[in-house]
Amino acid sequence: MLTKRIIPCLDVKEGRTVKGIHFENLTDVGDPVTLGQHYAREGADELVYLDISATQQGRNTFTQLVERIADGINIPFTVGGGIASLADASRLLDAGADKVSINSAAVARPELIEEIAQRYGSQFVVVAIDAKQRPDGEWYITTHGGTRFTDRELFAWAHEAQERGAGEILLTSMNHDGTRSGYPIPLFARLTADLRIPVIASGGAGCAGHIVEVLTAGGADAALAASIFHYGETTIAEVKQALAARGVSVRA
């Protein structure tokens, strides 16, 4: 049985870790390297750093930050945000990131998935998907932080990303993100059954039980969360204890 992974997510803006709902009303929650070290000590399996800076200056700061993270933590980490080309991905991987996460740019130009996978290998490529459920019940892809609907249906796009060389899918339900109301379990159960590659669940964790649920009933390979870890509402150790109690394999 593959070990289930717990992945804290750190949104970074102008070099600081921030947290808000739907990328708005952002609050500063600390230094990204210090926070990453804290989570590594707590037992995090991996980290995800998402650069939500809107400026080129912020992007440059992020590359320098990736070098600091690579020097400062001893667990794998993925970086994303603003990666629009192979050159962007190369810059961050060369700075020390273990994987890159691509989102809106992959929707706009799906060949980007293949370009990065062919250069570095699929294990370096995470395709992040921000999906939103429409009033008719269907799930569609959104871009630009969930603000723009596309005409791409979720399951078709996830399958295309897999075929183009994605090593993992990071799926966020924009309906649930930041609400702490739990993950949409039927959505993840369907997607994980549909794909060969690992699925990381994101968007909605409010307690350890929500994470346990998406990794068991939802079939996800990993769970990503931010608020509940940043604000100390639960710890990674508590989540892993709850998983172990359910007979789920976790890294100690």
Specify the residue positions occupied by each region the protein language model found.
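Structural preference for beta-strand elements that scaffold enzyme active sites
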Residues: R5-C9, E46, N74-T78, K99-S101, ...
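Conserved, mostly hydrophobic/aromatic
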Residues: D11, Y39, L47, V79, ...
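Conserved anion-binding
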Residues: V12-E14, V18, D98-L171, N175-H176
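Glycine/small-residue-rich loop that forms an oxyanion/phosphate-binding "nest" at active or ligand-binding sites
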Residues: S53, F62-Y120
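Catalytic cores of alpha/beta
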Residues: F77-T78, I83-G96, P186-A223
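C-terminal helical cap(s) of enzyme catalytic domains, especially alpha/beta-barrels
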Residues: I113-Y120, E213-A252
